[in-house]
Amino acid sequence: MRTNYCGLISEQYLDQTVTVKGWVHRRRDHGGVIFIDLRDREGIVQVVIDPDTPEAFAAADSARNEYVLSITGRVRNRPEGTTNDKMISGKIEILAKEIEVLNAAATPPFQIDDENISENVRLTNRVIDLRRPVMQRNLRLRYQVAMGVRRYLDAQGFIDIETPMLTRSTPEGARDYLVPSRVHPGEFFALPQSPQLFKQLLMVAGFDRYYQITKCFRDEDLRADRQPEFTQIDLETSFLNEDEIMDITEGMAKQVFKDALGVDLGDFPRMPYSEAMFYYGSDKPDMRINLKFTELTDLMKTEEFKVFRGAADMKGGRVVALRVPNGAKFSRKEIDEYTKFVGIYGAKGLAYIKVNDVGNLSNGEDSGLQSPIVKFLSENALKEIIARTGAQNGDIIFFGADKTKVVNEAIGALRIKVGLEHGKDNGYFTDEWKPLWVVDFPMFEYDEEADRYVAVHHPFTAPKEGHEDLMVSDPANCLARAYDMVLNGWEIGGGSIRIHRADVQEKVFAALKISPEEQQEKFGFLLDNLKFGAPPHGGLAFGLDRLVTLMTGAESIRDVIAFPKTQRAQCLLTNAPNSVDDKQLRELSLRLRQKAAETKEA
């Protein structure tokens, strides 16, 4: 029987006989003495096998990397000069008495300690990849976070309740994953994008405080921080307002970071959505980067420079500046790369001014400002730009001029890129945890393609008090009782106070151009139950995958999920999704269209 984990044997076990079981991480033959580094989930221990124990020596001699061994031996100090203070087991070794080969292993597709492996190779051989210490650490931390969440919410009186995985499709927002019903031919279940409606119904049912760590599914285009199936920390409360809900969930985040990382997150400042977009161009600003937008739209309405004037006069246009301290040293090549970068977000170019001498702000050839655009701007505008941005000698000022959405996304992304690349060396990046709440979101945003307003969060979010009439009269300025928790530029949680009155919910549906008939067909079960004395309620959902990605510093969300999908929504380990035979399709009353069938065969 195993007595100890490999990585947990320390000096306290000196002269004791122990039995460890694990995988051969490395095997070395040093002049007739064999050394084996044996690995299990807790780490590595060094085992010494000498010829005085011939059976153990023969077993060790036959072992290769990834063989599974059971080793019994005596714990002793390592020789002087061979210790490793970074490991719990770094000062001891095991002198083997007995070795049993529990299983041989084929040569693995890569070495466990190889750090230069392509992601495709790793995902195809995910089981071997999961043996790597970094992956073991990531998934252990994920477990610690999940358990910390459970402990905290249990102590706060929350009840863990499961909600259905097979539910009805409500095609609003992202596409649903559909599951055909064999019993009801031609009808489909949908996998839940979130437990939203069920958790609201649990509040109507009187459970008061609910939580669940659950899988959710969205059939959407994938990015580095997205998966078709993801894990959500979901919670809902009755009779609490947004301040009280934010206090509870902020406390949870602080406790989890303290327990898992030993980190004190400190205060969570609150920032209105309008301020976040005005200064940072993002509703999830990275506050580690001390760079802000400077508004120039009003100034450019009287300038002749067409690029800036056109954006300033455009309906929904915006002109901003982004001052970067010590940025005048950026090379032409670097600026060209930044220009190409903002093009990803729809920007047609990237104007800039290098500030060489703030004492000479003319627009002539001897100007202290260096840029192709200086001659097109009035001296008054140049002075105002320098005054508003607070630019000093040696700085560079970048400009965004276009539709507000393009400017916010392009210059917002540039702010992050420049901040991460140059901020630490130039004093405008702080490498620490910077949490905040973003509040007072718009209730609606206009969808030009659909030619109607859509919900910014979801259609069950309550309007801010005093804004109910604006849903009809001025939907663009109607604010929601919504809040997002943001950490270092990532939205890790989002929530809102919900609508608990059926008449208000019907008004929101009407503002979204959802007819009474469609309301009843899609959401009749919600509207009907809201009429039976629904309490005021609200909640929040955290993305567990994103949270753990941040906490581990992993490059990809796929590094904190045991068996993730690729960016093409495939599992390379199991080759899912896969074809099914005609018999299965017939049982489901389905038939592939000819084009789809031909594509599969190809």
Curated annotation (Swiss-Prot):
Q: In its keyword annotation, does this UniProt entry include Cell membrane?
A: no
**Localisation per UniProt entry:** Cytoplasm
SUPFAM superfamilies assigned: Class II aaRS and biotin synthetases (SSF55681), GAD domain-like (SSF55261), Nucleic acid-binding proteins (SSF50249)
Source superkingdom:
Bacteria
Where do the annotations place ATP binding? 218-220, 227, 491, 543-546
Query: Is Aminoacyl-tRNA synthetase one of the keywords UniProt gives this record?
Result: yes
Q: What does this protein do?
A: Aspartyl-tRNA synthetase with relaxed tRNA specificity since it is able to aspartylate not only its cognate tRNA(Asp) but also tRNA(Asn). Reaction proceeds in two steps: L-aspartate is first activated by ATP to form Asp-AMP and then transferred to the acceptor end of tRNA(Asp/Asn).
Quote the protein name from its UniProt record: Aspartate--tRNA(Asp/Asn) ligase
Q: Which gene encodes it?
A: aspS
